[in-house]
């Protein structure tokens, strides 16, 4: 009813709430990124323990609930199939299994899109975690020019393809071989982007 009334009154909702159907569901988010030729870690949808055995080539990996979960909640690090015995996992919801990367560092980037061709892109932020909790962030991130340009290019592409008007944050991984991956999209400044309040 609310959406119908908004259309009748010509009210534009920004950011578009439909975006949440993509970015708050990990499997949908990864598929969206793949369709736009944006590199992610290898992944598969998991609905039961047999699926993990089927995709054992993704181990060692991280098993994550497709929805909800943050700061390590709803996530299980699996070294191998035997490691399943060390966790109490209830397969009453959908998961995704992501292959671990040989991580060198994590960065994030805040972008605000006002309209077509009207952007404000902040410098990449370097993040350090302890036990899957963000400890601190520094800006600018200590990264090479290629990663700097590619992270901004992908963040801009994501906001365009989502037709996003507002502020979002894209989280990236850089592995030891200097490959760049998008880990997740947050439809807000993200905890790593709070420094933009006072740093600019």
Predicted feature residues:
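Short beta->alpha transition motifs characteristic of CBS
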Residues: 125-128, 185-189
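Protein kinase-like catalytic core scaffold
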Residues: 61, 120, 168, 180-184
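A conserved helix-loop-beta module that forms one wall/lid of the active-site cleft
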Residues: 16-76, 81
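A charged helix-plus-loop insertion that forms the helical arch/lid used to bind
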Residues: 12-16, 190
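Glycine-rich phosphate/pyrophosphate-binding beta-alpha loops
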Residues: 186-200
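Single conserved hydrophobic/aromatic residue that forms the stacking wall/gate
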Residues: 1-11
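Internal nucleotide-binding/catalytic subdomain
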Residues: 78-170, 174-176
């Amino acid at each position: 009813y609310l959406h119908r009334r908004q259309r009748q009154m010509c009210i534009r909702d920004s950011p578009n709430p439909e975006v949440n159907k993509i970015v708050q569901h990990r499997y949908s988010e990864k598929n969206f990124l793949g369709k736009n030729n944006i590199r992610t870690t290898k992944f598969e949808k998991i609905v039961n323990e047999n699926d993990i055995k089927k995709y054992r080539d993704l181990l060692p990996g991280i098993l994550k609930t497709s929805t909800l979960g943050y700061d390590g909640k709803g996530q299980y690090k699996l070294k191998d199939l035997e490691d399943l015995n060390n966790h109490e996992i209830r397969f009453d919801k959908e998961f995704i299994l992501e292959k671990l990367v040989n991580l060198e560092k994590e960065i994030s980037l805040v972008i605000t899109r006002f309209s077509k061709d009207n952007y404000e892109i902040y410098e990449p932020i370097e993040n350090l975690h302890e036990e899957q909790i963000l400890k601190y962030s520094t800006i600018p991130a200590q990264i090479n020019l290629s990663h700097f340009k590619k992270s901004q290019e992908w963040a801009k592409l994501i906001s365009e393809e989502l037709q996003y008007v507002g502020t979002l944050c894209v989280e990236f991984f850089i592995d030891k071989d200097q490959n760049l991956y998008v880990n997740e999209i947050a439809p807000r400044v993200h905890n790593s982007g709070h420094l933009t309040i006072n740093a600019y």
